[in-house]
């Protein structure tokens, strides 16, 4: 068998195995959700839960909030998350990457613990100096330990967890009993924002308060432009999950797809 054919078969087998794992995970959470008699919270339930949880806090006008944001700018976050948050107030932003590179193979053994300590110390200093209204994070279990999130929670500032693609990554890989996704950290946040509707039950089972907000687009950036069309279909996003298999199938059906982002032959757009 040629090497190229073997690689394709291996990728397809990996996709099949992951699909089975995700299906099993989905069914297990469905069963636990039903057996515990849980319910997905609606807007009124979320408001009541936050009111009871965040005693002593009062609403502020839009634009008047003091916000601490914790996330790494992979490629889109700085141009999307930060301007969106700034509509609600001032934003102080922590990105650990320059001091703690989390892309190395030995990240968990070498610098994860140090990064987590720095995160808690830095945010603690900012909280003491500024008394922010909210801490907004785009994190995962791969990046932070559950006890790190508990330490952040102890500062007494409302915390929001933002997560994308919980269909594949709510649990994700598990190393040393800890999930790379949101499973082990979500319960320590006051509110968990997920773009994956069928992950709501997973959050409830793990003791979190979830809200479903579907992915959208920033109309200031993503809008029709009068440009010559040179590509049948374009996709912009990192290469992972079922994306390669989806694009492979489209190409096999005669739909020419050009993909851009980390991991694709075309590379990122910026």
Task: Show which residues each predicted segment covers.
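Long, hydrophobic/aromatic-enriched structural stretches that serve as scaffold segments
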Residues: 132-135, 161
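Active-site proximal beta-strand in glycosyltransferases
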Residues: 152-168
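Compositionally biased, charge-rich terminal segments
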Residues: 1-8
